A protein has these predicted regions:
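Terminal alpha-helical anchor/extension segments at protein ends
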Residues: 1-76
Length: 76
């Protein structure tokens, strides 16, 4: 399926209602920079998954900008 990586792409996916699942690293959750995106995603019915940056999946997500979204459909 389609995936969005990084803050801007994830934000766009949420804005379009295309995000089915938003995945965020725990460090990005703590810094608060994505709080509005997370709130909007939950309000629009998307699942929000937090990955620990202490483990490999979270480390890989950090390498991709700390956020990603699995999409219901392709955008842009």
């Amino acid at each position: 399926g389609a995936v969005a990586y990084g803050d801007l792409e994830v934000r766009d996916a949420v804005d379009f209602g295309a995000a089915e699942t938003v995945i965020i690293s725990d460090s990005r959750l703590r810094d608060g920079s994505l709080s509005h995106t997370i709130e909007d995603a939950e309000r629009l019915g998307a699942a929000v998954v937090v990955l620990s940056s202490e483990f490999e999946p979270g480390k890989r997500l950090e390498g991709l900008g700390g956020s990603a979204a699995l999409l219901r459909y392709k955008i842009g």
